[in-house]
């Protein structure tokens, strides 16, 4: 399923369930402990999963040159919708030709290819403990040995996978278009549990304090215990969403196909604020980055929006020439984002002014990974780019 089809598919399914799908359900929930600083950002030398950390904040502690240069470009042959992971100076990314590839971070040379057998869409790899995990468009989860690209196990869901895996200890979390979030044993691929929703699980779950959080096409915000697969609570997400949730200090930030960005307090389960551009009414498919009291998100209105995390008031917007499905990343007071206009942008986090840009000439709808002073992103023309 292409990105452009997601809105129509969600709308069709949501319309059949909107009147009955959501009945608020919740179990008593103790107040959550504050997140540790390391949970809110990726380390300087790794970006091990989509958005860099369990909390999906899209923030890295690395330092990147003010005017980076193209270090290398690896030709993948087909569009990259998958976003890279970076671990131990190796880049892992899925391809539309159905491969998970490993490429050297410093030299851009291919280390190995794993053939999944079916195209890989937006599912982005997660890497931990010598294993790389990814989902494909026929609904198979793949586990691969990072040393040589040899298969370890596969697990079949009932529909395509656009969500990205999250590894927490010995558990792999994966959402599927069959409407379930799965908990799998990372070593064996055995199903530990399946949490069922009433529509697609498109976004990647963020995990804080042993609880997975995600909003989806059923217009419900879900919180699930990752050990048991039991629901902690479910509350209205107000609209269907293709974005993943970023979670900071017990507040979830995410965009919706109702043209809004929301801040949802998980303690009270109330919406703290809603942001909608006063003039441009377009959906948000991009996932938000959250850092230093600022929420940064790309919109299908062609704009990058920076919002006050407490109030939802716009701090600045920057207009590109095409829609933005790429999820921005942040490091060192800079915002890094691709646009379907073919440019990669670096903006000042405080002002929104362009610090640097690269004209690739092909849409950049995948999201960047930041590690070891480098930026890696794939284009729709099949080039995997590394800037340093």
Language-model segments: residues:
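Extracytoplasmic beta-rich repeat domains
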Residues: 54, 66, 72-85, 110-128, ...
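Blade/loop signatures of beta-propeller domains
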Residues: 42-70
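Compositionally biased, intrinsically disordered low-complexity segments enriched
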Residues: 26-41
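N-terminal export signals
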Residues: 5-24
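Short loop/turn segments that connect beta-strands within beta-propeller blades
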Residues: 104-107, 145-148, 186-188, 225-228, ...
């Amino acid at each position: 399923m292409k990105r452009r089809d997601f809105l129509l598919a969600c709308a069709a399914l949501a319309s059949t369930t909107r009147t009955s799908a959501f009945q608020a359900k919740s179990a008593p929930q103790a107040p959550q402990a504050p997140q540790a600083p390391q949970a809110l950002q990726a380390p300087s030398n790794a970006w091990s999963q989509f958005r860099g950390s369990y909390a999906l904040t899209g923030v890295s502690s690395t330092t990147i040159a003010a005017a980076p240069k193209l270090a290398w470009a690896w030709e993948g042959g087909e569009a990259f919708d998958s976003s890279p992971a970076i671990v131990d100076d190796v880049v892992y990314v899925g391809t539309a030709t159905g491969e998970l590839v490993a490429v050297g971070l410093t030299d851009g040379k291919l280390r190995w290819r794993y053939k999944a057998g079916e195209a890989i869409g937006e599912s982005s790899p997660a890497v931990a403990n010598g294993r790389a995990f990814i989902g494909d468009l026929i609904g198979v989860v793949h586990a691969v040995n990072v040393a040589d690209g040899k298969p370890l196990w596969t697990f079949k869901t009932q529909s395509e996978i656009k969500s990205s895996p999250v590894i927490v200890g010995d558990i792999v979390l994966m959402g599927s278009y069959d409407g379930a979030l799965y908990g799998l044993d990372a070593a064996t691929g055995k199903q530990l549990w399946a949490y069922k929703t009433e529509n697609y699980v498109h976004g990647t779950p963020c995990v804080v304090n042993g609880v997975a959080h995600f909003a989806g096409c059923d217009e419900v915000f879900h919180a699930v215990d990752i050990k048991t697969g039991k629901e902690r609570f479910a509350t209205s997400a107000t609209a269907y969403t293709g974005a993943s949730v970023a979670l900071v200090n017990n507040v979830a930030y995410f965009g919706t196909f109702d043209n809004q960005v929301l801040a949802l307090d998980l303690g009270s389960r109330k919406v703290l604020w809603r942001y909608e551009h006063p003039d441009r009414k377009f959906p948000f498919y991009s996932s938000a980055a959250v850092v230093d009291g600022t929420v940064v998100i790309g919109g299908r209105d062609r704009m990058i929006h920076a919002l006050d995390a407490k109030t939802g008031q716009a701090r600045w917007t920057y207009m590109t020439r095409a829609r933005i499905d790429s999820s921005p990343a942040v490091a060192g007071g800079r915002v890094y984002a691709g646009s379907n206009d073919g440019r990669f942008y670096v903006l000042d986090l405080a002002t929104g002014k362009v610090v640097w840009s690269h004209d690739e000439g092909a849409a950049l709808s995948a999201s960047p990974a930041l590690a070891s002073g480098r930026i890696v992103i794939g284009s729709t023309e099949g080039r995997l780019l590394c800037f340093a």
